[in-house]
Amino acid sequence: MPRKFRVLQIGGDDLEPIFQHKKGVSWDYFDIGLFEFDSGYVEAIEAIVEAEGRFDFIYIQAPYSETLTNLLQMISEPYNTYVDESFWSVEYEQDENVQKYVVQPLHYRNIEERNNKLEAVSFSGQYGDKVSPKLALVHPNFKGDVVYQGNSELTLSGEFGKEFKPIASWQNNLVYDKDKVIQIWPEFDIDGAVELQYTFRLIQTGADGALIEQIVLTDDMLDSPLEIPAKPFDAYISVTVKARGNGTVHLGPIHKRWSRLDMGQFLLGGSRFVDSQRQEFIYYFHPGDMKPPLNVYFSGYRTAEGFEGYYMMKRMNAPFLLIGDPRVEGGSFYIGSSEYEQGIINVIDETLEKLNFKSHELILSGLSMGSFGALYYGAQLNPQAIIVGKPLVNIGTIAEHMRLLRPEEFGTALDVLVSNEGDTSQASIQALNQKFWQTFQKKSLSQTVFAIAYMQHDDYDPHAFQELLPVLTAHQARVMNRSIPGRHNDDSPTIASWFVNFYNIILEDKFGRVQHAEKQNI
């Protein structure tokens, strides 16, 4: 049975009746009068938490008090607590616990909007997917040049006319999930004097397929994602694109996500960065115990969009930063424009600054595709340690090996090769490989510990560890490694176990953090 989304309301009129139709929501109400008349309220809430788990969302309709913030210290998690704007005050704003748990005011224009907002964000988990440009159908009346570039983009060049005319539609629809605000983010880029017009049609499921709603937006209206309000039924979303003018249009994937409105991307508190070419990465910061180090985890390849590694990193108790790459099919190795890559560096630097940490109080980590991000950006940030499993560094080679060594497997590498270098030639393969090595070899690595778990018979990047080791040796870096028999995807549990083990060793050795229960009891 799916886990319910647990909400605690503190003060105000009990809103549970509004949520009775949402079977996936469990609503608890706390009367603030208990602060004065029932000294056992702490034990009662502790019993609820122990029996049913922590609250996912806390909504406060009560004035600031020290008793209330002491309660929040017991039950709040970062980003999950909102105070009704009518009760928000300077006292809330300046309270240490409010700052620690990133408690924020809930803004709304009327009661209906408030209720809709609370309903919209009350769901467990996270979800996102996309439709690929390779599934787009070019309109037969378009007579210009057409180039499909895998899951990366569909390129249309030529004269589109003075009026908007259809150029492409997707043969696969997006799914509109009932009771969710659905966020839509189309990737596109334009060269020349071209304007685009996207049409999103909500179509009823079932035999009749009736049109429910039509949304038409030009490219300049899509600087922010489209958000379609929650509705009490499932539907499909069809997408068509029109263009006018003259030039080149690059149509990328169309992303669909469950929205948490202004409360976060995927998770409460999640964020996104987008460059001028509409290329994204997502990130989430958890303050942990606010003590060094900051642990950064780059997600691996994942077709379902969202954050990876939350519970693993949270168990370490230290501050952590999750970074994900939702582009192409399951990620694009965290490389892109200089603006995009600088964005990742800035997010890490700004998080260190927020914590008042130095670069030696930083650990970068990742598995498989995420290992590239950890090594590539780690070489530029001078961290205390870089921890990786199944390292992938030669993206060009990974793409090349799809032809004979790994047929029809992990075509994402080809998408990344073409989107970064323009083709699949040998020169482009080497150029993409060198993008990593030119950065990695020219940086000072002597103060960084490298912990690497790798597959002995890796069929993605067979010589990654053997090529990394001489560079690390030349820089006099400290290296810990573990080899596991098998190909790239043969033994993920053992790799993950060594990944966590390396973390435990470094956290204890460098930061005095004892992760093992038997040691903590000594």
From Swiss-Prot:
The keyword Transport applies. InterPro entries: AB_hydrolase_fold, Asp2. GO terms for biological process: protein transport. Keywords: Protein transport, Translocation, Transport. Disruption phenotype: No effect on cell growth, significantly reduces export of the cell wall protein SraP. The small amount that is exported seems to be glycosylated normally. SUPFAM superfamilies: alpha/beta-Hydrolases (SSF53474). It comes from the Bacteria. Coiled coil: none annotated. It holds the Pfam family Asp2. Part of the accessory SecA2/SecY2 system specifically required to export SraP, a serine-rich repeat cell wall protein encoded upstream in the same operon. Part of the accessory SecA2/SecY2 protein translocation apparatus required to export cell wall protein SraP. Belongs to the accessory Sec system protein Asp2 family. This is Accessory Sec system protein Asp2.
